[in-house]
Amino acid sequence: MRTLSRKIAVVVGGHGGIGGAIAERFATEGATVYATSRRAEEGGGDLGGGRLYPRRVDASDLTALADFFEVVGSEAGRVDVLVVNAGISEFATLDDISQDHFDRTFNLNVRAMLFAAKAATAIMPDGGSIVLVGSIADAIGTKGYGVYGATKAAVRSFARTWANELATRNIRVNVVAPGPTDTAMMAAASDEVRETLTKLIPLGRMGRVDEIASAALFLASDQSSYITGAELPVDGGMAQV
């Protein structure tokens, strides 16, 4: 039996990059996966041992997000696993931070995450799992990414609180915290930026999206049945040693 056989999973921010890798991995492990994105092409079908249904949803639009979960509840009846990956990261030092930058980042990285979790747990059976995609930025003060780091610290804090609140339902809440990862966004960075980041990673390379997906799968599945309220860094040791 595959790791997520017969599970209903939702990946908010599940198109391309880390989120896309998680959605595809969950489907190949037997889950029926609803993956949201502002750019998703609606449709979907069989993938490996499961099914993948892309859905076009702007997670920062709370009405659209609520409507999406109503559709999932109507079609699938429940959500066994929730992954919240939707987020943005923009450079701005303290002198340059604007209200728009702050609101835009917190609205997607924190507010959307909170209300996705609220909607999902309303139709999640006991024994479900929530995986929040955080970042090692919650633990290190990267110049120019103060607002982003603060949103990821909020993610970490919510995981602790929700793990306590949902424990009576045996719903586990954990964070997977990637370090620099080889995505299309990272590929667009300058060679200098990539080289500088790589030098800070003890393993000497950036992470791969499939490595992040493997960590998310572990936290989503019964393989981590005695883990809740935790953060799993997947950063090549960057923020650990």
Predicted regions and their residues:
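Conserved glycine-rich cofactor-binding loop
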Residues: 8, 15-16
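Substrate-binding pocket helix/loop in short-chain dehydrogenase/reductase
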Residues: 93-94, 98-106, 186, 193-197
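Active-site loop immediately N-terminal to the catalytic Tyr-X3-Lys motif
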Residues: 95, 127, 140-146, 168, ...
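Active-site helix of classical SDR
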Residues: 117, 151, 159
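Alpha-helical segment proximal to the catalytic Tyr-Lys
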Residues: 122-123, 164-168, 225
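Residue(s) in the substrate-gating loop at a strand-loop-helix junction
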Residues: 135
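Short C-terminal tail/terminal secondary-structure segment
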Residues: 140, 217, 228-241
